[in-house]
Amino acid sequence: MSTGCCRAPSRGSAPGVSDPRADALQLIRSANVGPITYRQLIARFGTPAAAIEALPMLAARGGGRAPLLADPRLVAREFATVEKLGARHLFLGDSDYPELLAELDTAPPALIVRGKLSLTQRTCVAMVGARNASAAACRFARQLALGLGEEGVTVISGLARGIDTAAHLGSLARGTVGVIASGIDIAFPPENRELQGRVGDEGLLVAEQPPGTEPLARFFPSRNRIIAGLALGTVVVEAAPRSGSLITARLAAEAGRDVMAVPGSPLDPRAQGCNLLIREGATLVQSVADILEAVRPIDLRSVRSPVNGFGGGPAGDPGDAERATVTRLLGPVPVSVDELIRQSGLAPAVVQTVLLELELAGRLERHAGGRASLG
């Protein structure tokens, strides 16, 4: 679905919608504004409205044209469509935004949710695995999900074929969360349309993309980070070494969450990813008790305060020499932000501001693991 961008920074507001929320959605739906950039803009300018006004200036400093701003009329239409679907928008900084997800530097600034958001306030465990999973693996995944539900644990998965489907079916009665890579009104795969509807009715359905968005391949890694971010730990049940499930496990590890895996036969390619995770230190899972033992000790850990979606204050501007220093250190090969700070000798806030300007100018690409490169 097109976000309907326009160059003029029109400041209209959606009828019946408070200005800060309409501004927040317009900002995140605008070109070159991703989750990290959104956080930095709010931290720097305080409100989405102030950030929108500053976008042309920041893009010019980064050497690019003013970014395309989302059309306020389409923002208003999105609010209306979501309401008609029986869903609502949830913004970073809202009091009921999931705390574990808010810990991520890449936490989605806006989600669309339908169902029982309170499920995210319980102990949450993600369960992922192969789409072409064996019957035995699907049966075991369903048993694990059922057992976790009986222990009051919310099971999170991605509504894909195979292990995801088994995880949702096993936990539907006690509480499950489905995170999808499409708009909340699009069922993928099509055969899971009924299951997706039940998850929204009886559990919680979560989407980052606006309604009408088809599940393009590039949206699945983003979906996976939400699955991992909502949970204290991720369980992998059957996965090839180069599967999306291992991407979810890696994202969980990068977020400081527990990674668990069900071992399998070394003769089955579908088990090689799980066996690799165990060899690298993942918790071996043979029962519900193994999962509970892994996540319960960290269930009461302190959680970093979520970003206030509409608060903050301005930061200082970098000079031309500082911009040149950071830009010179960048190239086509991704480099970590920590390395840029170390090599430049500049304050972290200065480096982050230069990267923000470059991204808004369309000259910077963000990569997993806090890395960046020139686009």
What do these predicted ranges mean?
Residues 1-15:
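Class I Rossmann-like S-adenosyl-L-methionine
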Residues 4-5, 44, 54-58, 294, ...:
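Short acidic/histidine-centered micro-motifs embedded in hydrophobic/aromatic stretches
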Residues 5, 41, 354:
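Residues in the recognition helix of alpha-helical DNA-binding motifs
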Residues 11-96, 361-375:
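Short, small/acidic-rich helices and loops at N termini and domain boundaries
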Residues 16-20, 91-375:
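Glycine-biased, small-residue-rich flexible motifs in mid-sequence functional cores and linkers
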